[in-house]
Amino acid sequence: MDRMKKIKRQLSMTLRGGRGIDKTNGVPEQIGLDESGGGGGSDLGEAPTRIAPGELRSVRGPLSSAPEIVHEDMKMGSDGESDQASATSSDEVQSPVRVRMRNHPPRKISTEDINKRLSLPADIRLPEGYLEKLTLNSPIFDKPLSRRLRRVSLSEIGFGKLETYIKLDKLGEGTYATVYKGKSKLTDNLVALKEIRLEHEEGAPCTAIREVSLLKDLKHANIVTLHDIIHTEKSLTLVFEYLDKDLKQYLDDCGNVINMHNVKLFLFQLLRGLAYCHRQKVLHRDLKPQNLLINERGELKLADFGLARAKSIPTKTYSNEVVTLWYRPPDILLGSTDYSTQIDMWGVGCIFYEMATGRPLFPGSTVEEQLHFIFRILGTPTEETWPGILSNEEFRTYNYPKYRAEALLSHAPRLDSDGADLLTKLLQFEGRNRISAEDARKHPFFLSLGERIHKLPDTTSIFALKEVQLQKEANIRSTSMPDSGRPAFRVVDTEF
């Protein structure tokens, strides 16, 4: 028995010293002995055991199928030879000399596995041979999914490449960008391609960078989805989901008279998407009907985040040259740069009124005229209604007449008392007095939509509820429906 222990010890020393472990693939190689017995000399105690070439073998398998070690017992005699080498053996012991490697069968990977792992659309069409390639070598399943690994995997599928998308029609053009209707080869779905020209001296416009940085982190049923980003030397292309029209075109197609039930659904979705943005500390800052996209189902989505920005603290100073004039609040018109989420709520009130009446509430062409329209309906502010207003130099300069506030119901007769109350709470002079998006969507005006609509996950459409349906418009025009049966896409404002 002492001699056997000596043999085992020497064999172990030989295995450790005979060949190092290759770590080139990130994991140790599996080492085993060949089927043949160890052919040592007659006196194993005098010399180290010699292993014939080929007896040590390394097995390197793919990461996805780590080999399983199977020990097969060999009978060895007291002279150190196996029964294969010597037919006579007086004392038999079992020793795990022979090691055979057994590979697990490759993992079967499905399209659903890839979609879930990489957060891809369910209708994605993977390139030919991609599944077979992953079956042989599947790093996205065998390693933690780092940002770099995810980027490489998406590129292999076709994301980030211009050739993945087919341009169909030119929808509009701005100072820096052109928007095209397009089609994705990956999903066969329509997309909107916002192609931003890169000036060599200036690089990408800050509005484009801002839009990308914010949208890639905003995941909500009422916010337009950014599908892809393609960066070349000459352009930056943003690939958005395609929606049929914007709210301005919807109003035009309805003869400026939207069914009041649909007004309620659109307003709720606007508030729902905006409340999510504000929870993420993002201000849109450019709300207007042209930036609210609507599809055939009636889903409304916030778009064009070119002027949006992340809000760090409520008192941060921002530019007052934001928000299209008609939807700009009076405190911003008078030069205030001290604002937070309330800047968006004034615009919501203006859009609510426009949906209910079919006309803009304050259609001024200059800042002075815009303020005049506001004060003529809501009343000229005083120290009682707007503390500190008389110390505002711009306000004193304009020297507006002393208007008395008018009842909003007289201007929007289709609103009920709850609707008028909500509109009043949105159209407050001081931002701090305006109702928040979160509180506004819980207003009694929306009671008829039921309780379940408030419990939906962020990424679920309100139309997932069977009790929520868009009603047919009485005056809808069919001119916006092309021969394909899909309504025309209204281009998002591309001016930067």
Swiss-Prot record:
Principal location listed in the UniProt entry: cytoplasm
Coiled coil: none
Biased composition (Basic and acidic residues): 69-78
GO molecular function: ATP binding; cyclin-dependent protein serine/threonine kinase activity; protein serine kinase activity; protein serine/threonine kinase activity
Keyword ATP-binding: yes
Domain Protein kinase: 165-446
Outcome (variant: S153D): Reduces interaction with CCNYL1
Active site, renumbered: D286
GO cellular component: cyclin-dependent protein kinase holoenzyme complex; cytoplasm; cytoplasmic side of plasma membrane; cytosol; microtubule cytoskeleton; neuron projection; plasma membrane; synapse
Catalytic activity of the protein: L-seryl-[protein] + ATP = O-phospho-L-seryl-[protein] + ADP + H(+); L-threonyl-[protein] + ATP = O-phospho-L-threonyl-[protein] + ADP + H(+)
Residue spans of biased composition, Polar residues class: 83-93
Effect on the protein upon substituting T175A: Reduces interaction with CCNYL1
Protein modification: Phosphorylation of CDK16 is essential for the binding of CCNY, but also essential for the regulation of CDK16 kinase activity. Phosphorylation of CDK16 is essential for the binding of CCNYl1, but also essential for the regulation of CDK16 kinase activity. Ser-146 and Ser-153 are the critical sites for the binding of CCNYL1 and for modulating CDK16 kinase activity. Phosphorylation at Ser-153 inhibits kinase activity.
Subcellular location: Cytoplasm; Cytoplasmic vesicle, Secretory vesicle; Cell membrane; Synapse, Synaptosome
Documented EC number(s): 2.7.11.22
Gene3D superfamilies the record matches: Phosphorylase Kinase, domain 1, Transferase(Phosphotransferase) domain 1
Family stated for the protein in its record: Belongs to the protein kinase superfamily. CMGC Ser/Thr protein kinase family. CDC2/CDKX subfamily.
Protein name: Cyclin-dependent kinase 16
